[in-house]
Regions:
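Alpha-helical membrane-protein topology signature
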Residues: 1-189
Length: 189
């Protein structure tokens, strides 16, 4: 965005979804009093908020971006109201928030599956990001192991789909590597 001074090929939704995800896990970490969750998700939320500000700055449709950000803030405020005012005790609050965050995380990990069908049809991985795939695999694995260490299913379970989808994408990078399955050898001049 900064290099091109444009947001023309970049979607806002992933930034908003990741920010909401970080803020949800930050709340869960605060309820659990888990320093690791608090620190990691505070940094994640700050970075995602910065990305959103940069997106807003370079966007030509500032009103549309602002409405989406306000929609996210309204959703977060409603969630905060539900979890603080309508949920009777801290254990129930923690369980509900853990379930919400887990569901949201799973949805984020399985959402790129639509791209996988496109990759298989086109026999090309051009629409996938290799660095993002590796990073997702490492982050999902780390959070799964951390959840296992804490015996916290809310942390462990939603990260397993991240591992699975990353392994599938890594296999696709191998399977549809450039130059693989060509019936001829290119001539070099």
């Amino acid at each position: 965005m900064i290099t091109t001074k444009s947001v023309e090929n970049i979607q806002l939704l992933p930034f908003l979804a990741t920010d909401a995800n970080n803020l949800g896990w930050l709340g869960y970490g605060c309820l659990k009093q888990d320093r690791t969750l608090i620190v990691v998700n505070s940094i994640g939320a700050a970075l995602q908020s910065l990305y959103i500000l940069v997106y807003f700055y370079y966007s030509t449709t500032k009103r549309e971006v602002l409405l989406k950000v306000l929609g996210l803030l309204a959703l977060l405020a409603a969630g905060y109201g539900f979890f603080t005012c309508l949920t009777p005790d801290e254990d129930t609050r923690q369980s509900y928030l853990g379930l919400f965050c887990s569901t949201f995380t799973i949805a984020m990990y399985v959402s790129p599956l639509a791209d996988l069908a496109k990759v298989i049809r086109s026999r090309s991985t051009r629409c996938l990001s290799f660095p993002l795939t590796v990073t997702t695999f490492l982050a999902s694995s780390s959070w799964t192991l951390y959840g296992l260490q804490l015996s916290d299913l809310y942390i462990m379970v939603p990260n397993v789909p991240g591992i699975v989808t990353s392994v599938v994408r890594l296999w696709l990078f191998w399977r549809y590597a450039p130059g693989r399955d060509k019936p001829y050898r290119p001539l070099h001049a």
